[in-house]
From Swiss-Prot:
Positions of the DNA-binding region: 8-34
Biological-process GO terms, alphabetical: DNA-templated transcription; positive regulation of transcription by RNA polymerase II
Cellular compartments annotated: Nucleus membrane
Top-rank lineage group of the source organism: Eukaryota
Pfam families: Fungal_trans, Zn_clus
Coiled-coil ranges (or none): none
Organism: Schizosaccharomyces pombe (strain 972 / ATCC 24843) (Fission yeast)
Protein name, as recorded: Uncharacterized transcriptional regulatory protein C1773.16c
One GO location term (cellular component): nuclear chromosome
Keyword list, A-Z: DNA-binding, Membrane, Metal-binding, Nucleus, Transcription, Transcription regulation, Transmembrane, Transmembrane helix, Zinc
Membrane-topology descriptor: Single-pass membrane protein
GO terms for MF: DNA-binding transcription factor activity, RNA polymerase II-specific; RNA polymerase II cis-regulatory region sequence-specific DNA binding; sequence-specific DNA binding; zinc ion binding
Transmembrane segments: 209-229
């Protein structure tokens, strides 16, 4: 089959790539006659037949040209071999450098804690791996999570449905009672609404629904859900979920997430709080993501440059940002997801306590709010500077970072308001409440307990990254103190435990001190028998806490209670193998322990 240098008429007409054959492939496909306008002159038919794949006429080379070409080819081949050898040498050097870097990183990781921040799932997996490593020596169970373990095993995936939504406007007096409760006990600690402005919109709702914005309606039903959920009567749980389903349905309408608005952020924050009550932590994560996008679009993380913005609105912007910052940062810590708001260049002032009375009658809530901001900022700094997997700190550099954060923690301790310091001393003493507390003081004391536990977790995160013996001691003593507070106040005292924040998992993950004490039990071979029994008792306290939290966090808390119970049984099994004299004490302890 002959090849032609020019394209055939069909290929030219249809602008196709012609293969120059007769008949060409395109003409065969279209069933057309293949014709070339300019035929190649076949003057040297023998040459064409000898090399018919090439249409250029063949001209024999002279002997001298042939020798020169051969010499050039040999030189090019030698140069290519030399270049290849050089590339192999460079490749070997790079491989050696990579292996050297890997070895140095492995040596560093023996001194420095692992790069990833201890999220809840990673903590549970670490505890399971520790059990496996300890029981392997006794040829016992070697795979604690035989079927694997992930966040899907912890967090429910159900979502609200429109079928259960509350489709009417509730009674005005009843709704006002719910709003008063919200501003009295929730908005004081998480200030995102000016009470006066919100109640003005509430009055408009019962005059004409068209006078209020759709985002306000979302927050209204979400607040009703929060208020009703705190009522411990069983028949009200469905009503609370019905109000929340209404909010959920309203944000599904087209366009809600397309345009950022301050009112939408406020509504989503309330929904995040109630989603925590339903253990819908995956929903919390998704809502936090949408909140972050709106916060960045509205530049709430920066002080406004708008001269026309009054001080009241500027203060509202600050408080909304810091509430979102706490929610998003603590959520990312628990899930182990990258932070969003924490990595922004934050130029936002702390809340002004002079505005506290505008958000709630109880101004003490501002003390709680400001302390939680400071602790969240510290947790984020610990995460980014000590647990960043991309950085392997040298000992000197790591100690410098730890020392710097220690200074900031000391400054935080000195800045704690006197009202809270008094309660902190009570928590450390562990002797129970010295006086009767009214409802307002009970809420404030519960919030102080949660701030103290958040403070303890901050210390644990810091000293987990410290390889020194002193750091390990501080980490263990802090974990024991945190568990003692949980046992003495949140498990035993019902008036205090009933006020626990729905966001307890994000603010202070109780599994963090649990894992610290649990690891010490299994890793310390010289542990005193009396101390060992006390530590096991502490582990049972965390188990009891999760059982108690079933009323607040439902299915999620129940799953955590099962996980901690399995870990405690494994610890008792291992310790019994190590020291049979202690085993009888464990049996008596597990039988007598009750919540």
């Amino acid at each position: 089959m002959k090849r032609i240098r020019n394209a055939c008429e069909l290929c030219r007409r249809k602008k196709l790539r012609c293969n120059g054959e007769l008949t060409c492939q395109n003409c065969m496909v279209y069933g057309e006659e293949c014709r070339y306008v300019k035929r190649v002159k076949h003057d040297n038919r023998a040459a064409v037949q000898e090399n018919e794949r090439y249409p250029i006429l063949y001209t024999p080379l002279s002997t001298s040209d042939h020798d020169n070409d051969e010499e050039n080819e040999i030189n090019e081949l030698k140069n290519a071999v030399k270049a290849l050898d050089k590339r192999f040498d460079n490749f070997e050097l790079k491989l050696e450098a990579l292996f050297s870097l890997l070895r140095s990183q492995q040596d560093s990781e023996r001194k420095v804690k692992p790069g990833g921040f201890p999220s809840l799932v990673s903590q549970i997996l670490s505890a399971g791996a520790l059990v496996d490593s300890k029981l392997q020596a006794y040829t016992m169970r070697t795979n604690f999570f035989s079927n694997g373990f992930s966040s899907n095993d912890l967090f429910p995936h159900s979502f609200p449905t429109w079928k259960s939504a509350f489709r009417d406007v509730p009674d005005k007096d009843w709704a006002k009672t719910c709003l008063d409760w919200y501003f009295r006990f929730i908005n004081c600690n998480w200030p995102i609404f000016y009470k006066k402005q919100y109640m003005e919109s509430f009055e408009k709702l019962y005059i004409d629904k068209n006078l209020v914005k759709g985002a306000w309606i979302v927050s209204f039903y979400a607040i009703l859900a929060l208020a009703v959920s705190r009522d411990k009567r069983v028949d009200n749980s469905k009503l609370a979920e019905s109000f929340f389903a209404t909010s959920w349905f309203l944000i599904q309408r087209p366009g809600f997430f397309l345009t950022p608005q301050l009112e939408k952020i406020q509504a989503l924050v309330i929904m995040i709080q109630f989603a925590s009550h339903l253990s819908l932590y995956n929903l919390c994560k998704k809502l936090c993501g949408q909140v972050c996008l709106m916060v960045k679009d509205l530049n709430l993380h920066k002080e406004s440059t708008d001269k026309d913005l009054d001080q009241d609105m500027a203060e509202l912007h600050r408080r909304i940002f810091w509430v979102c910052y706490i929610f998003e940062t603590t959520t990312s810590l628990i899930f182990g997801t990258p932070p969003v708001l924490g990595d922004l260049e934050i130029e936002c002032k702390y809340p002004d306590i002079n505005y506290a009375h505008c958000f709630a009658e109880n101004v003490q809530g501002d003390l709680i709010f400001t302390c939680e901001i400071s602790l969240t900022v510290l947790k984020h700094e610990i995460r980014t500077k000590l647990y960043n997997s991309n950085n392997v700190f040298l000992d000197k550099g790591q100690k410098g970072v730890i020392s710097n954060i220690q200074t900031k923690i000391l400054n935080f301790e000195r800045a704690i308001p006197s009202e809270m310091k008094h309660y902190f001393e009570i928590l450390k003493a562990g002797n129970g409440l010295p006086e009767e507390l009214d409802i307002i003081k009970q809420h404030f004391f519960t919030a102080c307990v949660e701030i103290y536990l958040s403070y303890c977790n901050t210390l644990i995160y810091l000293y987990l990254a410290d390889d020194s013996i002193e750091g390990s001691k501080i980490c263990l003593s802090t974990a024991r103190a945190a568990i003692d507070v949980i046992k003495g106040f949140l498990v035993v005292l019902d008036p205090i435990s009933k006020n626990i924040c729905y966001l307890w998992l994000f603010l202070y993950c109780p599994f963090t001190p649990f894992l610290t004490v649990f690891s010490h039990l299994l890793e310390d071979d010289d542990l005193d028998a009396d101390i060992c029994v006390k530590d096991v008792d502490r582990l049972y306290s965390i188990h009891a806490f999760f059982l108690k939290m079933k009323d607040i966090s439902g299915e999620f808390a129940e799953r955590l209670s099962v996980i901690t119970e399995n870990f405690i049984q494994s610890a008792e099994q291992y310790l019994a193998l190590q020291n049979t004299s202690v085993f009888g004490t464990f049996d008596a302890l597990s039988e007598s322990f009750s919540i």
